Curated annotation (Swiss-Prot):
Oligomer and partners: Monomer.
InterPro entries: Glyco_hydro_22 (IPR001916), Glyco_hydro_22_CS (IPR019799), Glyco_hydro_22_lys (IPR000974), Lysozyme-like_dom_sf (IPR023346)
Ranges of residues in domain C-type lysozyme: 20-148
CDD domains assigned: LYZ_C
Organism annotation: Bos taurus (Bovine)
Broad class of where this protein is predominantly found: secreted
Record's GO cellular component terms: extracellular region
EC number: 3.2.1.17
Family: Belongs to the glycosyl hydrolase 22 family.
Name this protein carries in UniProt: Lysozyme-like protein 1
Amino acid sequence: MKAAGILALMGCLVTVVEPKVYTRCKLAKIFSRASLDNYRGFSLGNWICMAYYESHYNTTAQTQLEDGSTDYGIFQINSDTWCRSTKLQEKNRCHVACSALMTDDLTDAIICAKKIVKETDGMNYWQGWKKNCEGRDLSEWKKGCEVS
């Protein structure tokens, strides 16, 4: 009887991370409120396009890379340089746990993405952006989303 009670209690304590996949327009509104539109010269369309090609708007996206590092969250931010997972050698330049980049609250992910754009070569950090968004008309990405 005690074992059943303990198991029930443990079941309540386990946190399950449910994948959150945003819509294009919901992200446009979140990104707009976070002042990403024209941040460092990159339009809102750049951010929406990049997030689509990096994670398909999935906050819990993870990609294991050949070098042993992992890309996390909606922006696919790398553990080797930008966030802390479990490895001690990581630089953690965003001063954030990688798990914080995979929540429905995009605050930490947006702050870190801004830091990446500011401290590196803009949005060139993201291969999805370079291949699919750079130099293109991105006005369609926010069309119909009720953002300016």
